[in-house]
Amino acid sequence: MASHILLVGIGGFCGAIVRYFFSRKLNSGKLPVGTLTVNLSGAFLLGAMAGANLSTTTTLLLGTGFLGAFTTFSTLKLEMAQLQLKKEHRLFILYTTITYGGGIALAYLGYWLGSFFR
């Protein structure tokens, strides 16, 4: 059990740092491209991991830990609220559509591709 917690912690530490890098580099305009990038790529990668049916150790380290910290639901919601408050309604709709539609599509694609590595 302690080893599982350590795996999640190590993965989470690394994932959070990488997400911070993406946010700092890409979230400079009206559309939060950094958050969009981490959430879409995270959906794809987690789908691929699920499709590949990886070991518990790998899933804890990379799935729960790294990708759990790399992707972000709370920042997404804050940025969506900020777009609405700034009356950026078109960007809000675009961001929401790409995030949810793209995330679901990429998770399915990742799962499908990952299943070839079982």
UniProtKB/Swiss-Prot annotation:
Known regulation of activity: Na(+) is not transported, but it plays an essential structural role and its presence is essential for fluoride channel function.
Superkingdom field: Bacteria
Subcellular location: Cell membrane
Record's keyword annotation contains Transmembrane helix: yes
Encoding gene per record: fluC2
Protein name as catalogued: Fluoride-specific ion channel FluC 2
Entry keyword set: Cell membrane, Ion channel, Ion transport, Membrane, Metal-binding, Sodium, Transmembrane, Transmembrane helix, Transport
Positions bound to Na(+): G68, T71
Pfam families (UniProt xref): CRCB
Reaction catalysed by this enzyme: fluoride(in) = fluoride(out)
InterPro entries per UniProt: FluC
Signal sequence coordinates: none
Sample GO molecular function, one term: metal ion binding
Role this protein plays: Fluoride-specific ion channel. Important for reducing fluoride concentration in the cell, thus reducing its toxicity.
GO (cellular component) term, any one: plasma membrane
Residues annotated as transmembrane: 2-22, 31-51, 56-76, 91-111
